[in-house]
Curated annotation (Swiss-Prot):
It comes from Saccharomyces cerevisiae (strain ATCC 204508 / S288c) (Baker's yeast). Pfam families: Aminotran_1_2. This is Inactive alanine aminotransferase. Belongs to the class-I pyridoxal-phosphate-dependent aminotransferase family. Alanine aminotransferase subfamily. Inactive alanine aminotransferase. Forms a catalytically active Schiff base with PLP, but lacks alanine transaminase activity, probably due to an altered structural conformation of the dimeric enzyme. This suggests this protein may have a yet undiscovered physiological function. Its cofactor is pyridoxal 5'-phosphate. One of its GO terms (biological process) is L-alanine catabolic process. Present with 3480 molecules/cell in log phase SD medium. It comes from the Eukaryota.
Amino acid sequence: MTMTHQQDLKGVFTAKDLDFKPAGKITKKDLNTGVTKAEYAVRGAIPTRADELKEELKKNPEVLPFDDIINANIGNPQQLDQKPLTFTRQVLAILEYPEILRVGHNELASLNLFSRDALERAERLLNDIGGSIGAYSHSQGVPGIRQTVADFITRRDGGEPATPEDIYLTTGASSAATSLLSLLCKDSQTGLLIPIPQYPLYTASASLFNAQVLPYYLDEESNWSTNSDEIEKVVQDALKKQIRPSVLIVINPGNPTGAVLSEETIARICLIAAKYGITIISDEVYQENIFNDVKFHSMKKVLRKLQHLYPGKFDNVQLASLHSISKGFMDECGQRGGYMEIIGFSQEIRDALFKLMSISICSVVTGQAVVDLMVKPPQPGDESYEQDHDERLKIFHEMRTRANLLYETFKELEGIECQKPQGAMYLFPRLVLPKKALCESERLGIEPDEFYCTSLLESTGICTVPGSGFGQRPGTYHVRTTFLAPGTKWIQDWKEFHQDFFSKYRN
């Protein structure tokens, strides 16, 4: 504030006005306890330490035993030099600056800056959006884009119809999940059935909305499969304790496990939902990331099959399915786009959801546009098709190659057990740590897998997440890693670290 402005305020208060002791600042104890209790390990203590080391590398690179930080803690491909899809970025460039379209299509195409189909898609999207991505959209999302999503779901599910009225365009899948949970978590007796291990968004949301976590454990020995009998037992135990199992979270393909659910398993999950009136939230953001001869089955497709086969038995199942532009081949994490499809909900619940979504006006409009590009990429015969197809194939092959290489590396190491990758972007190997390492972690006051991950980071620059951040069976220890980082040197570095670690702490 300038001296003149200070003088202007000089006579505002009397001596009596200023005769008080200034109140203290708010402290942590004044905050929402749901926030203070919530944990999100993906950006927790180890990634925070990685950021500190990254700054140290800039200032004093010679003091650390590595040259770079490998962010294997989060599924963020473009941070790790994955090239964006050309068609996507061409359309986005035009949407951001539609004056480009004042130049004729032929002239623009001759400059090799934009393909004709990118120009046409951008024109269609601008027309659907209303002329500018800087304007708010409908709270449920741009109607034309919702129609494109509905068409995609219909194709994906073998002709089972989807309608734009059931689609909400969202700011990523995370915002869809938290919006749904804020609506469905009525009180402290609401139970959320959450797979363990799980993506920590869900346990964090349970804390935020004061709900009860009802964990159901995945079976590691059978490739992290889901056991419906285990889920039903958790439901029955909760009911005995006067807890209402209201929401069942399913992550398919799994995060952090990479497991892909079979059609039969999904059917059994739907049966539990039908019997107990439990709403299913099916997190399907990795549906394109499928490896090694397994097949993705959407929850909605299986539910529709059951409704046809057993009339009346599954008609009341309420399902919200989530998808995102952050994964698959788009990997546009920073654009913040996604969708949810809701089916089986009554009109009064739909009205409440619409009101909730309207409070935040609308999702990011550029993110909505990228959703359109995700569900309707260039098709055979389009000018961009071959380039787009080749770029997607390259991403897929590189990801699958690194996934299998990392898996094979883990298989040959002492004290590490790993299930074969089926999907998603992660491996979740089990650590069988020497007693000496367990004692050292206890001395330091941290979990054994956190001790391992911290040692890995400090020795190699590889940033991972301890399994304790995702939940795991008591007495077991894991680490979650992506396989997104380019090259293979970091995998060799990890192998050498692991061998040295076990040599140091072997009983």
